Regions:
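Short hydrophobic alpha-helical membrane-anchoring segments
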Residues: 11-19, 346-352
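Alpha-helical transmembrane segments of integral membrane proteins
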Residues: 5-8, 333-334
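Alpha-helical transmembrane signal-anchor helices
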Residues: 321-357
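A "functional boundary" signal
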Residues: 2-6, 13-326
Length: 357
């Protein structure tokens, strides 16, 4: 996934203090405890989202106006986009059908682009390409162009990540870069699309301090506890990871994971990355709990989704666990040798004194 290429304090998370957290002491254990608590309350967060979904579905059934039906259908698509992939695909297709009934090629193209992105975000790259090739670019407005270029950028990134052929990988990533530049040209400066791509560009150029400053500005624009704040926090963690700041990387990964859980996001990524860091730090039990929760979420979002990523983290955990066992075994052997030598010394001393007597 795109994520593969490349996130709390005990007090309330105000944004100004949170953004400056790198200058303060942070309590990662308190953050992890908040994540543990949020995981235990996950059914409540899911029920809250289901309540919003039910309300929107009921309004859609009652609504007769095509214009309003398409608005509600898009609302349902957005609610499902990180919750249940099959339902998100269904409502994206409904949006396309309604837009076609309204004879709105601009909306048809935009919703096809959103459908294409949803497909490539759930390992359906061929279906994504199929939808994008049906879009009439000349009919798109500026918003539609952002979604269109963004979908192309994403699917080429996915293709580049998966292929084992080097020349194809280079070609796919070159196409991804070209569409990224197109998004930056048409997206509003300061929008979410513009911000995350700009952070990517700055990191690629190794301008990490500039990327960090932009990430701070982004965090000031989002509301704590939302999917948008989770997304911004993930990118902040990515910058700190490039800066080799382990604690701040884990901090922002934790912030991102916490918001994802509270928003009933099933398309989990941040928690998996955090679990990998924890495994490398030797916190095997907690890492396993996080992986199991993330795995269950991803299976609920889409079967087989990120299975390879879960397995990758599990492998890290197993290796860390093996290293821990090996270290324990070495310590036990060393301790046994020391005890044996001490016993031998004690026996020698006793025998020596008895002979002198």
């Amino acid at each position: 996934m795109v994520y593969v290429r490349y996130l709390l304090l005990v007090v309330v998370f105000g944004f100004a203090p949170a953004v400056e957290a790198q200058d303060e002491s942070i309590d990662l254990e308190a953050l992890y405890q908040q994540i543990d608590d949020a995981i235990s309350q996950s059914p409540q967060y899911v029920a809250e989202l289901e309540g919003r979904v039910t309300g929107s579905r009921d309004r859609l059934l009652r609504e007769e106006s095509l214009e309003k039906r398409i608005q509600i259908a898009e609302e349902l698509f957005q609610l499902y986009s990180s919750y249940r992939n099959d339902s998100a695909l269904h409502y994206a297709e409904l949006c396309i059908s309604l837009a076609d009934s309204l004879r709105r090629p601009d909306l048809v193209g935009r919703f096809r682009s959103l459908l294409a992105y949803q497909c490539s975000n759930s390992d359906m790259d061929n279906e994504s390409l199929e939808q994008l090739r049906l879009v009439k670019r000349s009919a798109l407005d500026s918003l539609g162009l952002v979604d269109y270029y963004h979908a192309w950028m994403h699917v080429y990134g996915e293709l580049g990540s998966y292929t084992q052929r080097e020349h194809l990988r280079l070609d796919y990533f070159a196409q991804q870069d070209a569409y990224r530049d197109s998004v930056l040209m048409v997206a509003d400066e300061g929008s979410e699309e513009w911000l995350h791509l700009k952070v990517d560009v700055l990191c690629a150029r190794q301008l990490y301090q500039d990327a960090l400053e932009l990430s701070k500005e982004w965090l000031k624009k989002v509301t704590d506890g939302t999917h948008e704040s989770a997304y911004a926090a993930f990118y902040c963690s990515m910058v700190y990871d490039r800066l080799k700041n382990h604690d701040m990387t884990c901090y922002w990964l934790g912030r991102s994971a916490l918001d994802d859980i509270k928003c009933a996001v099933m398309n989990q990524a941040s928690l998996l990355f955090l679990a990998e860091h924890l495994a490398n730090d030797g916190e095997i039990d907690r890492a396993l709990r996080y992986v199991e929760f993330a795995k269950a979420c991803n299976l609920a979002f889409s079967p087989q989704m990120r299975a390879y990523q879960v397995n990758s983290v599990v492998n890290v955990i197993e290796k860390s666990s093996q290293v821990s066992r090996d270290q324990t075994r070495i310590i036990l052997v060393f301790a046994s040798v020391v005890i044996f030598l001490l016993l031998m010394a004690l026996i020698y001393t006793i025998v020596f004194y008895r002979r002198r007597r």
